[in-house]
Amino acid sequence: MTLSKLNWDSPMAGRAPVLTIAAEQRRIHWAPVVVHGLLLCLATVFLISGGAAFTLYASGSIVAPTFLVLAYLEGRKAPLRITPISVYLFWNSFGLGFSAIFMGFKIAQGVWIDFSVAQILPDDLATGYVIYLLGSLAVHIGLNYMRPFENIKRPNPAGRSSVSFAGIAALWALGVTYLFRASWFSSLGNVSRPLGWMALGALSLFVLVPRERMGISKRTFGVTLFIGTAGLIVANIQSGSKAFIMFSFLPVIWMLLVRRDLRRWSMPIGIGLLLFYFGVVAPAVGRSREVQAQEGETAFTHLIDSFGAAPRVGTNMFEQFSNQLDDFLSRQFEAVSSGYLVGEVRRDGYQWGDTMSYAMYAFIPRLLWPNKPSVSRGAWFTAYLGAAAREEEATTSTGISATGELYWNFGVLGVVIGMCGIGLFYGLLWRMAGTNPQKPLRMLLYVLVSIPGMLDMPEAVTVYGGILSQFLLFSVIFYVMEMGRGRLATS
């Protein structure tokens, strides 16, 4: 029996996930993957026949609109409109699309691309881009193969059962507590990672479930949505992360996409949030990192003061937006690490696992080893690049990326196998959550796969370790919940 013949029962049915034979329900559509593969072929042809600059801006000009269309088509057929695949394609439409165009024109102007304190040869950068595009295709294949499929039959009445408003509120409160006091949970290691997304997952489920099923009035819904969003914004401001601050608005955007009566507001609110990011959030967070906090000033108040110093409408407004857009496109070009490592491989050869030795302890839970070394290799890579004398002295974390680490160690074949494995295992987690989760913990898993899972793929070993911890954690939780429901049913 193969995994392709197994399917998790839909959470709409009100049951814990159990594996069932559902071959007749698995209708895998490979057309988007084929289109993705054709993009890779075109980029490879450009790399062989054209220069580095042409490869980047020509490939990016095709990848950007194609990925956006594929993301739209993927979301349109999904009950929640947002799926791991749609998020992955949408996100990479910038990293492998618009950012590639931006980098291509910079190279055409004779500018070398910096990577920390190092510089990358244009040809290496173009090769790294194609390798990264190959890795994205491998992830797409794995996700598409393991994606969940709902039962084609109409959901039974249990699928329209009530949803606990108190349970959603409790999980939101626990998630916000974690965001304010993450140090309280540090001893849990990877097990505590879902807590950082619990408030977002709870608020997302709140806006997606009809309020009648939660037994609340329209007024209560509106007040709760405002309080939930405001609390999430305040908690995420404390993180000092531009991405986390903007993630606070995801439940509202999600609600607009799913509810037809509100969908007309998606475009104006989306544009407003875009202007808010480039005009306020990005410059304020950037300024907070440049200006040292005063004595007695907390990270939260320091960032709030920086918000107050955000650019006002005036003569320099366009310049501020332009600078922030340039910074955004530069940061989004994650293939820069692959480009640097292409040069390392050409000079020193493949590492054959030498830089992945931390895998020997990465999969050991911190609960069993409280003093376990850090699994993230960002500080180590910063020192490797020469930006710090030693790993312990590094003040910044430089991402290797899963694709870059796999190529550095095992070449193109390692990228194909390793990234496809990441897609397969994230697809398994997606299948555990279901396509339309109706319970808070299932929604939390869905959010974990769709947002941090698809947007943040650091070192390959780190990604695999995170997937394993989430699989074990949620498998135990779902099993215990199923056993509890079974005992209640028989009592």
Where do the model's predicted regions map?
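Aromatic-anchored segments of alpha-helical transmembrane domains
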Residues: 38-45, 91-101, 170-179, 227-236, ...
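N-terminal "leader" segments that precede or initiate the main folded domain
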Residues: 1-152, 252-257, 261-276, 469-477
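Membrane-interfacial loop-to-transmembrane alpha-helix junctions, especially the N-terminal start
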Residues: 24-36, 79-93, 156-168, 215-225, ...
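Hydrophobic alpha-helical segments
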Residues: 182, 237, 392-491
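Long extracytoplasmic/lumenal interhelical loops at the membrane interface
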Residues: 346-413
